[in-house]
Swiss-Prot record:
Keywords attached to this entry: Cell membrane, Disulfide bond, G-protein coupled receptor, Glycoprotein, Membrane, Olfaction, Receptor, Sensory transduction, Transducer, Transmembrane, Transmembrane helix
Family annotation (Gene3D superfamilies): Rhodopsin 7-helix transmembrane proteins
GO molecular function term, any single one: olfactory receptor activity
Transmembrane segments: 42-62, 70-90, 111-130, 155-175, 194-214, 218-238, 258-278
Topological domain spans for side Cytoplasmic: 63-69, 131-154, 215-217, 279-304
Gene: OR8G2P
Name used for this protein in its record: Olfactory receptor 8G2
Residue spans, topological domain Extracellular: 1-41, 91-110, 176-193, 239-257
Species this chain originates from: Homo sapiens
Residue positions with a glycan: N18
Localization (cell): Cell membrane
Database matches in InterPro entries: GPCR_Rhodpsn, GPCR_Rhodpsn_7TM, Olfact_rcpt
GO CC terms of this entry: plasma membrane
Any single GO BP term: G protein-coupled receptor signaling pathway
């Protein structure tokens, strides 16, 4: 009878693939050293304030200035909105955790944070590619710019960016909800992300890890290659500019954008384009700071 009861219990656990024995998690945060918490709080509070002010200013300025109602600034305002949302999903909770003893997040709140984080992270990848393509058309095909980048095309490009974000996030979160999380309730991260949550699973994570690698390859490498190709053509066009002043101005504008893009895709690739066993979670936490907080702060200054 005891054996049968044990078997029935195991079967119920296996069939409850979309449930977790954990009702709340403890976020380990960036550092466990108490003396660093206040310094980290002040640092990331400053970064978040700059991010919010910079991106809101960009959106407001573009919205109120009729002469900025062009495809380029339309995409820049869209990118600022994504950056604002991307940072807001992560940073406020992280700031609270710096000044509280127990960094608790409920299971539903954790899954919600994961879902919206993935939407805007994936959307940012593709929006950066769209802005690079827009610059390529403007510089390399200026006579066809108004035809290629019509408002109709701009609208559908933006829709495509969000569709890819929602689709990718729904797939990842849906498969995450199927896992039985029971090893521990401590997430070794400062927010609910894919690999830290997979590490808590008592059931097989093979499909989840395969999906992370496949979808990350598409959502990171495809936009990155699009941006790389766009800037190769842009730089080739810049080199044909006879004016030294015009060439240096164009290079300075592009270099700041390339730097922000390189930091974003480089840190994202380090986090998601390798198996979880390759690098430590502490290394991944440091890497994730760049694409969750640093790049959203830099984008308004580097891309405009």
């Amino acid at each position: 009878m005891v054996f049968l009861s044990s078997v029935e219990t195991d079967q119920r656990k296996m069939s409850a693939g979309n449930h977790s024995s954990v009702t709340e998690f403890i976020l380990a945060g960036l550092s466990e050293q108490p003396e660093l918490q206040l310094r980290l709080f002040l640092l990331f509070l400053g970064i978040y304030v700059v991010t919010v002010v910079g991106n809101l200013s960009m959106i407001t300025l573009i919205g109120l200035s009729s002469h900025l109602h062009t495809p380029m600034y339309y995409f820049l305002s869209g990118l600022s909105f994504i950056d604002l949302c991307h940072s807001t999903i992560i940073t406020p909770k992280m700031l609270v955790n710096f000044v509280t003893e127990k960094n608790i997040i409920s299971y539903p709140e954790c899954m919600t944070q994961l879902y919206f984080f993935l939407i805007f992270a994936i959307a940012e990848c593709h929006m950066l590619a769209v802005t690079a393509y827009d610059r390529y058309v403007a510089i390399c095909s200026p006579l066809l710019y108004n035809v290629i980048m019509s408002y109709h095309h701009c609208f559908w490009l933006t829709v495509g960016v969000y569709v890819l974000g929602i689709l990718g996030s729904t797939i990842h979160t849906g498969f995450m909800l199927r896992l039985f999380l029971c090893k521990t309730n401590v997430i070794n991260h400062y927010f609910c992300d894919l690999f830290p949550l997979l590490g808590l699973s008592c059931s097989s994570t093979y499909i989840n890890e395969l999906l992370v690698l496949v979808l990350s390859a598409f959502n990171i490498l495809t936009p990155a290659l699009t941006i790389l190709a766009s800037y190769i053509f842009i730089i080739a066009s810049i080199l044909r500019i006879r004016s030294t002043e015009g060439r240096s101005k164009a290079f300075s504008t592009c270099s700041s954008h390339i730097l922000a893009v390189a930091v974003f895709f480089g840190s994202a690739a380090f986090m998601y384009l390798q198996p979880s066993s390759v690098s430590s979670m502490d290394q991944r936490k440091v890497s994730s700071v760049f694409y969750t907080t640093i790049v959203p702060m830099l984008n308004p200054q580097s891309i405009a």
